[in-house]
Amino acid sequence: MDKVDKSLDTWREELTDEQFHVCRLGGTERPFTGAYHDSKTPGIYHCACCGEALFDSDAKYDSGSGWPSYFQPINDEVIASLDDYSHGMHRIEVKCAKCDAHLGHVFPDGPRPTGLRYCINSLSLKLVPRD
């Protein structure tokens, strides 16, 4: 996978203010406000910054958290994980492996088959519906 390397100024020009805050500065959208938190449209969720395919709607479920939740990414290579100690707690941050966009966090309280909950900001995603 070829990495996307752009300056913050370039990202700021290409993204909405809200997308820039979440994807490039690591912000979080308020729960139950994102476009995809309750979407049931079949399709593939892509990175809003670089277009990389990240999650299939078949792995999406309602976690009750207010953010889109998935039990697995399309494959392990599309997601980068790193320790996040912000806000006085330890979490695992997930980013797009291609462009380093902040997506959200992964928690060990998801459903089978993985037991994982990828809690993702809608602003980090773009849904491409299935035909």
Curated annotation (Swiss-Prot):
Gene3D superfamilies assigned to the protein according to its UniProt record, in alphabetical order: Peptide methionine sulfoxide reductase
Keyword Ubl conjugation among record annotations: no
Biological processes annotated in GO: protein repair; response to oxidative stress
UniProt-listed Enzyme Commission number(s): 1.8.4.12
Active site location: C119 (nucleophile)
Ranges for domain MsrB: 8-130
Name of the gene: msrB
Binding site for Zn(2+): C47, C50, C96, C99
Cofactor: binding details: Binds 1 zinc ion per subunit. The zinc ion is important for the structural integrity of the protein.
NCBIfam families reported for this sequence: peptide-methionine (R)-S-oxide reductase MsrB
Pfam families assigned: SelR
Gene Ontology CC entries for this record: cytoplasm
Reported cofactor(s): Zn(2+)
UniProt cross-references to InterPro entries, sorted A to Z: Met_Sox_Rdtase_MsrB, Met_Sox_Rdtase_MsrB_dom, Mss4-like_sf
Family: Belongs to the MsrB Met sulfoxide reductase family.
GO molecular function ontology, one term from the record: zinc ion binding
Catalyzed reactions: L-methionyl-[protein] + [thioredoxin]-disulfide + H2O = L-methionyl-(R)-S-oxide-[protein] + [thioredoxin]-dithiol
Protein name: Peptide methionine sulfoxide reductase MsrB
PROSITE patterns: MSRB
Keywords: Metal-binding, Oxidoreductase, Zinc
Enzyme category, top tier: oxidoreductase
